[in-house]
């Protein structure tokens, strides 16, 4: 089934994608990979010929889509962010300065990251954006990478054809055990999707859950007190140049109590049927019997937040209402405060918070006051001070010191996605560009931090 409303819309991503995929229905990963390497070699050749090198022009004051955030409680200045198509950036001074640490990889679309529980220099990075999008460009990845020196060097860990890595979990007591959820390729069916497990730090992987070549796993959660207890959200999803199908009977929740050897569906009290879409999962650290699930239907409408108080045996709907954006497959994540099982955060067009276990939700990142950009994709809650939050969305990175009461934007991240750009030939310092989710913008100076939005949304 294809959503016909999507077929009739002419989105920037359709124009952008069709230019690069014609006459095919997809952009083969190998083609994309080869062209990036070709451009990198061309840049080196130009340098040898004393041709004027490229100069960074910005913007650093606009931002772009963030897909994941990892930070270190022992080292409060250290933050890693993963972006939709700009790779991984690292800061040691809480965002005053950023360093790209993943640029040597030809594919810079990031799905998820995981930081080692005791060594923040060890970071796993899963490539391929898991947010499928409808009016945006989303790229597949080329597997998982790991650094043990904070990004100075990287080791490739395989899973080349997994499409997008939506979640990475590291066993808290035995960090050699790593789980990876794979959504598969976005624009085609493929069997390299499901849940993978490694018992040697990613050197080798075993596929421990597979449903079909059109059903991937969009989220996973672990009971940190009993790390063999795992919960996963499956998502039946497909997209092509003619339309999207973001739901089906293959979407649902599964669980395992033996480290992934046996999986069983968790259905009692949950929605079922052909219209189930994206699902987000979170397990309470303080009360691991409590699990929260955020449900969206196949058309992107919000279905509700469900809670289990018995390790996923049964579910109920606490009743908290959240406004639907109508394209909620674009977000879909849910988080629980590490110190309080009653505090729950739901990410959508804006960010919502509940302080009573999901019975009521209220917005904490409402764009009506121009304080926070829309489309929330990632949240990091500092475990030692849960009032300290980092929020990632289509507009970049934001910081709150009072559990979402107020937000401050952290700039200097050059991750804006441009569809096209133009130079004023009479005044070459004047640059113009059209971007994904950050409007049309311009700069009238040579300053990288002096870009301004002039139209669009």
Predicted region positions:
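Beta-propeller blade termini and top-face loops
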Residues: 1-457
